């Protein structure tokens, strides 16, 4: 269960004074860089995707064992999983470590600070936070132009989705993060906003907690029209657990065979592919708004 939740929670607005190379991360920690980072260690898959998206490759000197995209990330030295190996990080001589709030324990962060290694922490709560983080990371590594281009391209795609979804009636959706205990996404999670942007109505969206525990009775009462299961090699809901939902025949989603899978890395990772995730969700919820083109 912990891995499923960690995979999801891997940004808040940031402030930066470029002249002094002093940045403030999402934990309101001031991070000083004497010069743009040239040796960067990533502590989360979403961070790794952002680093490569803004044009880094050789500069990425270490990643976690969960970092599997893009393909170049698989060849990078590994610094551990959700618990970073401090000795391995130190041996890579980074001038910047970028992580996320839920992928680094407070004691590990404190030790990195004691070693005088600059650590910048992201903690996204909205899709806009994620897009803002691309800009943030671009500034940290002196790839501002590349970051702006990536961000603008993603915003253009998001605006297209908003336009398509403007006239649809939202479908009631239940997103299954975990089954035992039963966990979903609340208003405090960026995934909640993804569901809404895609033309969905999160049936537990009034819950403030980002990843609330819910009861089966509550979900049956709210009668979702779509059941959504993240799947993937690193995380996701096993097929056997998905099929158990079919016995609840009173659910609209079951009665109309609307149990859908979505690639976990497109929804659970707050990185550049999050917009692709929204596109996939929108096509899943409202396929009629995305007619297939026919050759002729």
Predicted regions and their residues:
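His/Asp/Glu-enriched short active-site or ligand-binding loop at hydrolase and phosphoryl-transfer sites
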Residues: 64, 188-211, 229-231, 261
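Short helix-initiation/N-cap motifs at beta->coil->alpha
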Residues: 24-28, 77-87, 103, 207-217
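A ligand-binding cleft/hinge motif common to bilobed small-molecule-binding domains
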Residues: 104-114, 226-244
């Amino acid at each position: 269960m912990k891995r499923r939740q960690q995979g999801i929670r891997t940004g808040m607005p940031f402030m930066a004074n470029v002249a002094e190379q002093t940045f403030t991360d999402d934990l309101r920690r001031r991070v000083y860089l004497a010069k743009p980072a040239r040796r960067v260690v990533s502590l989360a898959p979403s961070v790794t995707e952002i680093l490569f998206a803004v044009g880094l490759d050789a500069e990425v000197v270490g990643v976690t064992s969960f970092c599997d995209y893009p393909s170049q990330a698989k060849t990078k030295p590994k610094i551990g999983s959700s618990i970073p190996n401090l000795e391995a990080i130190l041996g890579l001589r980074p001038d910047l470590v970028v992580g996320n709030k839920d992928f680094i324990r407070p004691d590990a962060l404190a030790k990195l600070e004691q070693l005088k290694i600059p650590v910048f922490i992201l903690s996204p709560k909205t899709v806009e936070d994620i897009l803002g983080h691309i800009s943030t990371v671009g500034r940290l590594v002196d790839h501002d132009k590349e970051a702006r281009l990536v961000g603008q391209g993603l915003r253009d795609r998001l605006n297209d989705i908003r336009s398509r979804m403007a006239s649809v009636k939202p479908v009631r959706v239940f997103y299954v993060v975990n089954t035992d205990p039963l966990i979903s996404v609340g208003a405090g999670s960026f995934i909640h906003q993804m569901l809404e942007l895609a033309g969905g109505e999160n049936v537990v969206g009034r819950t403030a907690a980002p990843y609330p525990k819910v009861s089966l009775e509550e979900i049956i009462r709210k009668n979702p029209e779509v059941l959504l299961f993240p799947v993937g090699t690193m995380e996701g809901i096993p097929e056997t657990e998905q099929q158990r939902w079919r016995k609840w025949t009173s659910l609209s989603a079951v009665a109309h065979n609307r149990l859908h899978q979505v690639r976990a890395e497109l929804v659970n990772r707050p990185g550049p592919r999050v917009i692709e995730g929204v596109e996939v969700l929108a096509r899943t919820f409202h396929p009629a708004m995305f007619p297939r083109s026919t050759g002729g």
